[in-house]
Amino acid sequence: MLQNPPTHVRSILILQTKFIGDLVLASALARNLRLQYPKARIVFLCEANFASFLLAHGIASDVVAFRRVRMRGTPVQRGRELYAMVRALRRLRFDLTIDLADSKTSRIVVRLVNAKTRVGYDPPEKPLRWMECQPANVLTKPFGFGGQHYLYRYLSPLEALGVGLRAPVPTIEPLPLETARALALLDRHHLRRNAFIAVHAGASFRGRQWQPERFALAIDEISRQTGLDFLLVGGPDERASAERIVAKAASPVVNVVGALSLATLLAVLGQARLFLGNESGPMHMAAAAGTPVVGLFGLTDPAVWGPVGVASVTPRPSMPCECIARDLCRRPDPSKACCVWRLEVKAVVDAVLAILSRKVKDVEHAL
């Protein structure tokens, strides 16, 4: 840990090779670095699908992108992608690298880029393998500033660098053009701003997706009690779940799953009265846009991965979980467990009504 922040920092590389939710949380790190080093160029290493979002919203000054499908391909494909990635990074000559990815590949990249100041975790999330070394020369704690939420893992490098925490939660302002597009979309579907609930039924693993039939039942009950409208959002690979919800729900549900860019999705979420959905990237996007959240959790601990900075409720089935999907569930890995399937419709409806009535004792406005 440094006593004083490094000086003369002109170029910073943040390695965040995970998914959109992680990038949203990491945007708070970038914001604090921008406040400390207003003239520095902040570059993200990230998956190509997220590059335009980071650039458009000012989270990154520049992006070096990679294709995840190639990094998971043949050894030749991985080698070529890694070579192109490192070659592009070395041209930029960084003063500071921050390895949020904390992986074998990211440590190779940090070593090859070889910035003067290199921040990495001690201990790493997974133990180093034989013959693997930590290239960082500034070691940061797994969680910084006394926090337990994963956000504080991404903020921890600030503490190691001696940089103060001035922006404690992610906030991402939708772009004016995207807000105009969002309002036009709402108008086309006869939805009023702040009078609809954005619903996201997808997640990266099927076991983390609450059943579409239960979403439909919850939508019908919430509609009956509140009169609010519903808008289904999500990516192209989540269309099947959305169609099942539309088919099962008695209430009208507008379905735009697969039709929005990330930038437009952020703007749409910013117009919603509430976000209702699984633990996922769009949940963190909604919170960053300032929209209250009801996030549905299973084995994953909401205290570690829940929404931050907004009013929120995170209903969860009782634990320990009596497994109901032994053929699919891969406990104890929370990212591959099916515990959310045990979550009852009433608990979700009650959580939504509590947020809407602001009678939530444990509403989290900021960490």
Explain the meaning of each model-derived region.
Residues M1-L367:
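Catalytic machinery of carbohydrate-active enzymes
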